[in-house]
Amino acid sequence: MERLNMTKKIMLDPGHGGHDPGAAENGLREKDLVLKIAKKTKTILEKVYGASVKLTRSTDVYIDLSQRAKLANNWGADYFVSIHINAAGGTGFESFRYDKLAASSSTGKQQKTVHDFIYNKIKAKTSDRGKKSKNLAVLRETKMPALLTENLFIDRKEDAVLLKQESFLDLLAEGHAEGIAAAVGLKKVSSSSKTSPTPKGVKMAVVKPNADGWLWVYDKPNWSAKHKKVKPGEAFTIDKTVTVNGSKMYKLKSGLYITAATKYVQIKQK
């Protein structure tokens, strides 16, 4: 019950969509990239931090700016992040808060937290354009603390090379997820439960019932390397336990990986 009380509602907003591709250059479209980053971020926030996460859009559809804010307001989100890719000359990463809010405000402090987490993931590959403020609709019309990120420049060849790499999108997603979790006070779900000593014999990880009705298994020990969905009740033979970004995963006999969080799986002896 205590964990439920601590759960935060996070609304992720992949910019553009449908007839609005956003910026497009170098064989890339902003609307596709930001949706991919948002989905990866959602997975990490849910599986690693136990957050309740929604996307303003999960497919290639157009939603106007006021409706995006309304979705977050009506849900009662605790935090809102709109994800974008920049254009029109330049390079690097930057973030925005509503311009009526000072850097010293609570929203400004949360901006600093999320911004720094993201930039620290990618600083070896790009530059920091700073923590900025602007009168943007999704920042102005949302009732909760809100942030907009601009993740490199789609029309700069060097930035586009990075944005074409799945591993770089993983870094952006990790930065967003870890930064958001830190900003709203979410802890890793594994940190609240001690790992029991591994019993001898063959162990099975059995998927527990959950609100989604499914759980991801992964190709490798990486929360973004999703392979397929499995259903509650499905059981998998455990090979060993590994630690990924501070949280536990089970490596399965099949070579795939699954979360070790007791919220999602239970262990049974074969």
Model-derived features: positions:
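Short acidic, gly/pro-rich beta-turn/loop elements at beta-sheet edges
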Residues: 22, 91, 105, 159, ...
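Acidic glycine-/aspartate-rich tracts in secreted/extracellular proteins
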Residues: 18, 153-155, 256-257
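Catalytic-core environment of secreted peptidases
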Residues: 7-25, 81
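Beta-loop motif signature
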Residues: 194-251, 257-270
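A broad, low-specificity signal marking well-ordered, structured residues that form hydrophobic/aromatic
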Residues: 10, 93, 146-147, 205, ...
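Glycine- and acidic-residue-enriched helix-capping/strand-helix junction motifs
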Residues: 22-36
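Active-site-proximal helix/loop segments of hydrolytic enzymes
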Residues: 2-9, 32, 36-193
